[in-house]
Amino acid sequence: MHHPRVRTAVAGLVAVLSLVPLAACGQSDSTAPPSSAKPATSASASLPRPKPYTGDFKKLEREFDARLGVYAIDTGTGREVTHNDRARFAYHSTFKALQAAVVLSTYSLDGLDKRVTYTREDLVAHSPVTEKHVDTGMTLKELCDASVRYSDNTAANLLFDPRAAGPKGLDASLEKLGDDITRMDREEPELSRWVPGEKRDTSTPRALAEDLRAFVLGKALRAPERAQLTTWLRTNTTGDAVIRAGVPENWVVGDKTGTGSYYGARNDIAVVWPPDSAPIVIAILSHRGTKDAEPDDELIAEAASVVVDSLSS
């Protein structure tokens, strides 16, 4: 694994160059028209040059036979790293962080003691926490904890408010936040059965990062609810091998992972706190080339390392 602390100074220089605005004028060569000629008007003349880190992401895509989407922003400087950041990907279980935020907004911390009962018939695959509490039920706070920190699928389904049309209600809440990109259509585990070309249960790296930033760093939640969401994300148990593995060890990471049933899909969205520096918001989404491909955490970790190199130089 190539961690940021062992990358070469050349990589850092390339990252710096990627953040310098392009000059307005073009370069000339021996075949260029004389100065009296009209400026070029072809489409190619107006195309932006590839960012230096784009080559790193494309190399990862080739190495892992994967499609990769990345959006990251240093909230202190506004500097961004982008790669397919406006393209659609299945979000998989990353939505659980946003869902918990909406629950916090709806009920506040004081309302999370409400107990939800359910039966064994309500259990779905990968429910390591809820399967132990069928007899007693769980509070909204316990369900959010199970959903965000353990990616418990039944907990997420129980948090979909039936009075607000389930997933569509969450979709509407995100639209009120300003996100008209993310589509919430199905519950677990069906939402993880995405196939290429499908728009259901998809978003973009940019949209997910902007949502996460609004909830964790912005004013979408009151301070007590924002602190609780941050605690859940920072104590997530499923993210050690993804974004956390691609940033320096002394950086604090709060994240929510996602894994698809098909095409080796693996995602992670995170807020990262470098020491003595403003937070960085990162969303990395991916899927691989064949339906039976396995997810590979290394792809996400390596992509996170590219992000850190590009923003830290």
From Swiss-Prot:
A Pfam family that the UniProt record links to this protein: Beta-lactamase2
Key words of the record: Antibiotic resistance, Hydrolase, Signal
Catalytic reaction(s) noted: a beta-lactam + H2O = a substituted beta-amino acid
Signal sequence bounds: 1-26
Low complexity compositional bias, start-end: 28-46
Residues at which substrate binds: S151, K256, T257, G258
Domain of life: Bacteria
InterPro entries given in the database record: Beta-lactam/transpept-like, Beta-lactam_cat, Beta-lactam_class-A, Beta-lactam_class-A_AS
GO BP annotation list: beta-lactam antibiotic catabolic process; response to antibiotic
Disordered, as annotated region: 28-52
MF terms in GO: beta-lactamase activity
Keyword Hydrolase: yes
Enzyme active site: S93, E188
This enzyme's EC code(s): 3.5.2.6
Positions marked as site (Increases nucleophilicity of active site Ser): K96
Further remarks about this protein from its record: The class A beta-lactamase family has a specific amino-acid numbering system, sometimes called Ambler or ABL numbering and often misspelt as Amber. A multiple sequence alignment was used to derive a consensus sequence and then the consensus was numbered taking into account insertions and deletions. This allows use of identical numbers, e.g. for active site residues, despite differences in protein length. UniProt always uses natural numbering of residues, hence there appear to be differences in numbering between this entry and some papers.
Family per similarity comment: Belongs to the class-A beta-lactamase family.
PANTHER family: BETA-LACTAMASE, BETA-LACTAMASE-TYPE TRANSPEPTIDASE FOLD CONTAINING PROTEIN
UniProt cross-references to NCBIfam families, sorted A to Z: bla_class_A
Protein name, UniProt field: Beta-lactamase
The organism of origin for this protein: Streptomyces badius
